[in-house]
Amino acid sequence: SVSKPNVIFVLLDGARWDRLHTSNDFQEISKEGTLLNNVTTAMPYTVGSLNVTFSGLYGKDNGVDAYYNVLKLKEEITNLPIIFKKEGYFTACDLLHEKILANRGFDIHQSHDEFSDDLEIKHKNLIKQCLEKANGKPLFLFLYFSRLHTITVSDVLKKYEWNDKRFYNKKDENLKRYDNGFKEVGKYMRGLLYSLKKLKIYDDSIIIFFSDHGTGVGERFGERNYGSFTYEETIRTFYLFISKDFKKGRISEKLRDTIDIFPTVLDLAKINNNLRRPGDSFAEFLLGNNNELKEKNYTFSETGALHGLYPSPDKSNVFCIKTPTQKLMYLDSPKQWKFFDLINDPNEMENKYGSDLGTEKKLQKILNEFINNR
């Protein structure tokens, strides 16, 4: 029988799709695989986002549907760690804190200290430890690289209240700080791949570098980093898939969403998936059997902020539907609609709501169904 591939998810917490070019390391590494850089996260904050990726279900369906519901993953949900463990994998994760992913399906479930741990070393040691304990079983790993979080969240929230104009007035400086942090991300990625090659498991592995959400640098008043709104800088994420079987050096900007990752990964690992899930696999594209990535007609994202103009940590109150060219946003607290032309106004500066009634009505109907069906 063909031996099963290791599956290694590596979260680059808070990494922006539009700043990938600032790291030479990232640019070099992306030549080793296929990059999707227009994947809508169903929720632009870590716990919500990860639980969608790992369960293949929207937050409204998996139980983790708000900041305060981080521990509410429904008992009956079968997610990737549970499936891979059942398939004979040795499973492990290293998290920013242990509540981020439920301790279900993991042989090793540990967390790190973002301020004192050297994650390149810590993760290399975890992989070695897993190889020793696995007794020849393949590995399913989730590694969480939190350095950007420390720089853009932990340091910023300590310094500025949500309505501190000083923060929003220095976007350039904030962006520079972000970009410097992202260079550290690239360096970590390079070190990790070097370790996998040295441990002789690179060739037998599917490696997925991804972001859970982007990070604002002061573009929107009331959002110091992410989780308050559903603009592109926080909901548009990327996934870089690396394996000797995947097409190399390809970049796709086609619209996909995070519910598609679950069926894709199961297909790549040749695991029969008879679970009913809303996502669509794009494994054939990664394997080079399809030249074009099929685009989604629309994707959804939702959030409810911890602080800011419209805090709502116990249920989502900001929603959007995004097509390849447009976005309709609904803010429930002020009962406000926004409509953006993503082609001519990629930074979403001009609310065009009311300018294209036919399209708006059609998208409103679909978005309302998504909002009300919970």
Language model features by range: what are they?
Residues 1-374:
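Catalytic domains that recognize anionic headgroups
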